[in-house]
């Protein structure tokens, strides 16, 4: 019970980390700072930097504890940088957010209660899918063997080469690093902390979209979020994102389905207001870079989502510059897809041991 309570508290730890990483990018912008948007940007920046560190260590065949030490140092550096960057704008941003919350306390309380109920139902459920077990198994195997992606988490067999499907998707290895650092059991971290983090992030992106759609009308925003969460809880099928949010909550695909793809829709709404907003385009590009770390499915789905939502802006706003910008944001996923195809065709392979 004590461990479970601590795991719930670590959800706040994740959001603080995301905020500090995001502050490195968005800090110093005066009263323009948005707390939710900073967390959102920090999520992708965090995982993008992590996968750079992780792949560097993997290609040098170094153990997990080396990555843990290096990433701990990087987290400390980025946290300090985030605090320095946001020192002038964090207080005004908090005051602005607090004023809006206090003026709409009933709506936020209702959203909070429903979110807590949603989290409780999901965390107390028995998640038995094979894919979901992979994430805990890979995290536990990495910690137990002090290696990175060198053992099959289902069988325990040694792998002579890195599976390219998970080579860039280092989401579960980040779990292993944090579990090693904080001495948290992988099952507790994945099942409780990361599942709760995913649910809160999904509600946060709904709130961000609601603010863009309805402005400061908290009544409409509340109804919007309640309807979305109700749909997630009662419309669980293999064809909906709700399946990942309710039965495969601590998978990277859960964040892809319920944070990344809705996030691109949020970007689309922002660009409808101002198609030339450079910060919004940079955020979309950051998402395109960071999403493949969460799940390799991002390699195809993110470019497809961008093509469906963003490219039509060129017609709607009569701006041809939208097309090359959207293409640039699609490029990371396309490149990783080509690399995976080359791996499947035996054109490229990365071994788990020195070949020379």
PLM regions: where:
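Membrane-embedded, hydrophobic transmembrane alpha-helices
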Residues: 1-99, 322-326, 334-356
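Membrane-embedded alpha-helical segments of multi-pass membrane proteins
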Residues: 13-17, 70-74, 197, 201, ...
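Transmembrane signal-anchor helices characteristic of membrane glycosylation enzymes that use polyprenol
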Residues: 103-130, 330-345
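Active-site lumenal/periplasmic loops and adjacent helix-entry segments of GT-C-fold
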Residues: 115-231, 241-250, 259
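Membrane-interface transmembrane helices that cradle and orient dolichyl/undecaprenyl
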Residues: 261-280
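Perimembrane helix-loop-helix junctions
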Residues: 302-330
């Amino acid at each position: 019970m004590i461990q479970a309570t601590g795991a719930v508290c670590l959800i706040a730890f994740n959001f603080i980390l995301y905020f500090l990483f995001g502050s490195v990018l968005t800090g110093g912008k005066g009263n323009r700072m948005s707390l939710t948007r900073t967390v959102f940007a920090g999520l992708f920046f965090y995982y993008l930097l992590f996968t750079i560190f992780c792949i560097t260590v993997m290609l040098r065949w170094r153990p997990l504890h080396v990555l843990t030490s290096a990433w701990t140092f990087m987290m400390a550096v980025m946290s300090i940088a985030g605090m320095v960057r946001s020192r002038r704008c964090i207080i005004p941003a908090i005051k602005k957010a607090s004023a809006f919350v206090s003026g709409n306390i009933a709506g936020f309380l209702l959203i909070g209660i429903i979110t807590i109920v949603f989290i409780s139902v999901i965390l107390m459920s028995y998640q038995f899918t094979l894919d979901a077990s992979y994430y805990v198994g890979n995290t536990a195997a990495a910690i137990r063997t002090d290696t990175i992606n060198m053992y099959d988490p289902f069988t325990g067999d040694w792998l002579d080469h890195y599976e390219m499907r998970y080579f860039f998707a280092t989401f579960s290895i980040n779990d292993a690093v944090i579990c090693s650092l904080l001495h948290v059991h992988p099952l507790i971290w994945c099942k409780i902390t990361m599942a709760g983090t995913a649910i809160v992030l999904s509600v946060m992106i709904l709130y961000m979209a609601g603010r863009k759609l309805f402005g400061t009308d908290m009544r409409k925003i509340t109804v919007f979020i309640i309807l979305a969460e109700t749909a997630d809880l009662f419309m669980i099928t293999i064809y909906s994102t709700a399946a990942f949010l309710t039965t495969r909550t601590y998978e990277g695909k859960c964040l892809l389905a319920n944070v990344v793809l809705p996030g691109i829709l949020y970007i689309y709404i922002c660009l409808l207001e101002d198609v030339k907003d450079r910060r919004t385009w940079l955020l979309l590009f950051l998402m395109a870079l960071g999403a493949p770390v969460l799940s390799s499915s991002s390699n195809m789905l993110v470019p497809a989502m961008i093509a469906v939502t963003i490219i039509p802006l060129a017609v709607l706003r009569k701006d041809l510059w939208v097309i090359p910008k959207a293409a640039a944001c699609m490029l990371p996923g396309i490149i990783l897809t080509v690399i995976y195809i080359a791996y499947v065709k035996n054109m490229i392979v990365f071994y788990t041991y020195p070949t020379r």
